[in-house]
Design a protein with these regions (language model features):
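PP2C/PPM-type serine/threonine phosphatase catalytic domain
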Residues: 1-382
């Protein structure tokens, strides 16, 4: 999740010193992530944080408008039709047992995270994505959507959208937007006029169409009377042979990270639409700008109240093996500069170089650094 310049960021909940659940009016909340808990719970079902025994009576659950959204909830696509998603069978993260239809493990009884909290994608062996709610938040407002041809290095589409935390239903809207953009870019294969320049121009137009399509999907998933219209970032990349085409709105990013033994330098391809980037452009050091006041406030976004959702686009020719990475700030918060991400990926890939385990390892690493935000990671191997 990210912030919008036009809105105040949601206050972060601070942990109680003794590890007990905090009270907010009549409700109990986890001291670690702020999710609602019940008296007597041994641990938070959202972030697994241990809780001290509570003397208070159980409190009502979250209202429907604030409750975490299952990935099995129907999404409204831009043509007004419903797009149903099917639950994925998964083992219990605690004991490996079977998770029942009620969401609880049939062996140990632990409630499993819902599908929207953590999911992975792998349409081809050389492309993968992982999306996770992190540790500090009780809902995942990041979304990934990817597509690829089966032949390694042929063509891949990576999309990441990061829902704005202060807007309503951004978890649903970001997923709808990411999928809509992915579907358009998978289907759209412009050839231009047979020259590299014309192909780059045609792909730039495709990126703009993808952002517009994603914007329609976000609006379609926004309640007409909502005072805080759903909104999200947009970052997409297409890897086709030795060419990368990319576009972004907001502060989700696209990186090209060649292998360590390559003479080619790692590079952040996209440029953020954010307060931090504006300060960097004025000469403020990156570390200071990205950790200063309103650093993650974005200046462009997708959504009904967006004044400008036309993406910045670009292209790059790559030479040699490496990784195309599209990610939300939940990852780059902890490794912003391209060389740092290049070294991190090299270290994690040494244990398992396959894209899916690597994407999962990047998410795990971000959580180990604090997991203060949702995390969206999409990878393609070149």
């Amino acid at each position: 999740m990210t912030e919008q310049t036009a809105q105040e960021p949601r206050p972060a909940s601070e942990p109680a010193a003794d590890g007990t659940a905090e009270t907010n009016g009549a409700s109990l909340r986890c001291p670690n992530c702020g999710a609602p808990v019940e008296a007597g719970d041994a641990f938070c079902e959202s972030c697994r944080h241990p809780l001290s025994p509570q003397a208070e009576a159980p409190v009502p659950e979250l209202s429907d408008s604030a409750a975490p959204i299952e990935i099995t909830r129907s999404l409204v696509v831009s043509d007004g039709q419903d797009e149903d998603t099917v639950p994925i069978s998964r083992p219990c993260p605690n004991c490996g047992g079977v998770v029942g239809a009620d969401g609880y493990c049939e062996i140990c009884g632990m409630k499993a995270p819902n599908e929207r909290d953590h999911y992975t994608e792998q349409p081809a062996a050389w492309v993968a994505a992982c999306c996770d709610k992190g540790i500090r938040h009780y809902r995942n407002e990041d979304a990934t959507a990817i597509g690829a041809d089966l032949e390694p290095g042929s063509r891949a589409v990576l999309v990441v959208c990061d829902g704005v935390s202060t807007s309503s239903d951004s978890d649903v809207a970001s997923l709808a937007g990411a999928r809509a953009a992915r579907d358009l870019l998978v289907a759209s294969r412009p050839a231009g006029l047979g020259t590299p320049a014309s192909l780059t121009s045609a792909m730039a137009q495709a990126m703009k169409q993808a952002a517009a399509t994603a914007n329609k999907a976000v609006i379609a998933n926004t309640a007409p009377d909502s005072e805080n219209a759903a909104s999200c970032t947009f970052s997409a990349a297409v890897l086709e042979g030795d060419q990368i085409y990319f576009g972004n709105v907001g502060d989700s990013r696209t990186y090209w990270l060649p292998d360590l033994d390559s003479a080619e330098p790692p590079v952040q391809l996209s440029v953020d639409d954010s307060v931090a980037q504006a300060r960097i452009s004025m000469g403020v050091p990156r570390d200071e700008a990205e950790n200063g006041p309103q650093a993650h406030a974005i200046t462009k976004w997708l959504g009904r109240d967006s004044p400008d959702f036309v993406p910045m686009t670009g292209a790059r020719t790559v030479d040699g093996p490496g990784w195309l990475l599209v990610c939300s700030d939940g990852l780059w918060n902890y490794a912003s500069e391209a060389p740092a991400l290049q070294s991190l990926i090299a270290e994690l890939a040494a244990a398992d170089p396959d894209p899916l385990p690597l994407a999962v390892s990047l998410v795990k690493w971000a959580n180990e650094q604090g997991g203060k935000d949702n995390i969206g990671v999409a990878l393609a191997r070149h």
